[in-house]
Amino acid sequence: MPEVINRAMALTGTFEDISFAELLQLLNVSHKSGKLSCWRGTERAELHILGGEVARAVSRRERGPEVVYRVLGWKTGEFSF
């Protein structure tokens, strides 16, 4: 289960506990803003969330919606918001 670290909505967890799609839905419904870092092995993705919407997404190889689509396919990995 994801762990809330403090009142500033620091949230960490694994995609085994909550899927990337569920995490995006949680951030959207709660209109959160911040940086969502995702990683799996050597793969990294960084998403900037503004009012619950993905405003920017980057990885080492891609930018934009392709990053979101790639991470949607991850069944394992970790995240921090």
Predicted feature residues:
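Acidic, Ser/Thr/Pro-enriched low-complexity segments and adjacent helix/loop capping patches
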Residues: M1-F81
